[in-house]
Amino acid sequence: MAEWISKTLGELTSFISKGIPPKYVDEENENTIRVLNQKCNRNFEISYNESRIHNAAVKKVPENKLLHSGDVLINSTGTGTAGRVAQIFNIPMPTTVDGHMILLRPTKEIEPLYYGYVIKSYQKKIESLAEGSTGQTEI
């Protein structure tokens, strides 16, 4: 029988970063990628409906900030939105997040779905870490 192995979340996270400061454009082309923002993160789910388009020809997006299936996203600013957690699996096009979101990526040692469940279970705690006033709260 296998024994349980105990590890910290930090040991099971391969990458953590805030998103990019995007250069938005109105129309998609071969040089654009999708940018998720806080409006895209609701009820533990990600929706592309409120996503915007970034011109990667003007400002290149680092490869490690392009989303991977299993990444966890946390809203980092705003009263009532800071601390919202969602995990993304369906990435239909090259996508990143803006600077109001935090990107966490699991290591290969953990099942991504389980990694997401663990972080989602701490959403209330993460929300309580937000500091600031007059609607400018930040994690």
Located regions from the model:
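Non-catalytic DNA-recognition/assembly elements of restriction-modification systems
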Residues: 1-20
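Short secondary-structure boundary/capping segments
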Residues: 25-27, 64, 93-94, 137-139
